Amino acid sequence: MKKTDELRTIRIDPLITPAELARQYAITSDIMDTVIATRQNIARIMTGQDARLLVVIGPCSVHDPIAAVEYAHRLYELRVKYKDRLEIIMRTYFEKPRTVVGWKGLISDPDLNGSFRVNHGLAVARKLLLDINALGMPAATEFLDIVIGQFIADLISWGAIGARTTESQIHREMASALSCPVGFKNGTDGNIRIAIDAIRAAKVRHLFFAPNKDGQMTINHTSGNPYGHIIMRGGRAPNYHPDDINSAVKHLREFDLLEHLMIDFSHGNCLKEHLRQKNVSKSVSYQISHGSKAIFGVMIESFLEEGFQTVTNNQPLIYGKSITDACLNWKDSVLIIEQLADAVDARF
């Protein structure tokens, strides 16, 4: 029989439905309360009703659930300690966008060996989010694949759209449907206009096609997300300095958008040298302590151990060390959080 379709598809595997995964790993009432309260807190911080600073911190990507839970335990202690000045949320990224190729994250390849046991990856990710939230530690993630959100979005307090997908129409439409506040990164070249356009697009109603929780293809009609914001992540040059922030605020004002933004300490802002995140923190803390109201949040790449490691066949991995972007170690992370908390004192 002749075919004109699926000619380059090697195989098609069955995928668990979001509803079935949620039955196996069910959200509890206490976790619901954590997620709802955190989303509300972020909205209040964004709109200037809460003077605290949002801090999204954690590993570049999650590859080891055990190490991630240990990190969450440690971070929760800081969340409690600084709760009057900071709203600390753990970065739990399960999908990795790639410029060309590479490991695409815990959900796609949980065994780190190219076996692509996606159903297992989804289960590991959802269980991990339940474990982290059960501690009272809210979770943040990047939404890359537009279907994966159906499996985990109920456990996410803050979401991001990455620099490579901010300009994508379907990601803007998806953001308009998400129940959490969503940050849009500026382009990899530093262009902030695409992020501002994304905020404007996600703010209004859309319709798009996607499977529902039971796997049935549906037409989604969205109400729009009022809590979109820009994440300044640098580009060809850093963009966390006062002039960069003032320029971004001016552009936000032109479109009557919330004049608050988030600073990513990593990526282009640290010139891809992870230790420079400490320099970014020093500058941002200075700006906050000297009256900057525009900076409502920051993002930091941090793990138990400093740096990164390469996955090699038959070689054990160093516990608590990133396998994607290099991260700050725990000691430096504690110092940065303390520095940010001290800076926020000026707002009270």
UniProtKB/Swiss-Prot annotation:
<keyword id="KW-0057">Aromatic amino acid biosynthesis</keyword>
<keyword id="KW-0808">Transferase</keyword>
<dbReference type="GO" id="GO:0005737">
    <property type="term" value="C:cytoplasm"/>
</dbReference>
<dbReference type="InterPro" id="IPR013785">
    <property type="entry name" value="Aldolase_TIM"/>
</dbReference>
<dbReference type="GO" id="GO:0008652">
    <property type="term" value="P:amino acid biosynthetic process"/>
</dbReference>
<dbReference type="GO" id="GO:0009423">
    <property type="term" value="P:chorismate biosynthetic process"/>
</dbReference>
<dbReference type="GO" id="GO:0009073">
    <property type="term" value="P:aromatic amino acid family biosynthetic process"/>
</dbReference>
<dbReference type="GO" id="GO:0003849">
    <property type="term" value="F:3-deoxy-7-phosphoheptulonate synthase activity"/>
</dbReference>
<dbReference type="InterPro" id="IPR006218">
    <property type="entry name" value="DAHP1/KDSA"/>
</dbReference>
<comment type="function">
    <text>Stereospecific condensation of phosphoenolpyruvate (PEP) and D-erythrose-4-phosphate (E4P) giving rise to 3-deoxy-D-arabino-heptulosonate-7-phosphate (DAHP).</text>
</comment>
<dbReference type="Pfam" id="PF00793">
    <property type="entry name" value="DAHP_synth_1"/>
</dbReference>
<protein>
    <recommendedName>
        <fullName>Phospho-2-dehydro-3-deoxyheptonate aldolase, Trp-sensitive</fullName>
        <ecNumber>2.5.1.54</ecNumber>
    </recommendedName>
</protein>
<dbReference type="InterPro" id="IPR006219">
    <property type="entry name" value="DAHP_synth_1"/>
</dbReference>
<keyword id="KW-0028">Amino-acid biosynthesis</keyword>
<comment type="pathway">
    <text>Metabolic intermediate biosynthesis; chorismate biosynthesis; chorismate from D-erythrose 4-phosphate and phosphoenolpyruvate: step 1/7.</text>
</comment>
<comment type="similarity">
    <text>Belongs to the class-I DAHP synthase family.</text>
</comment>
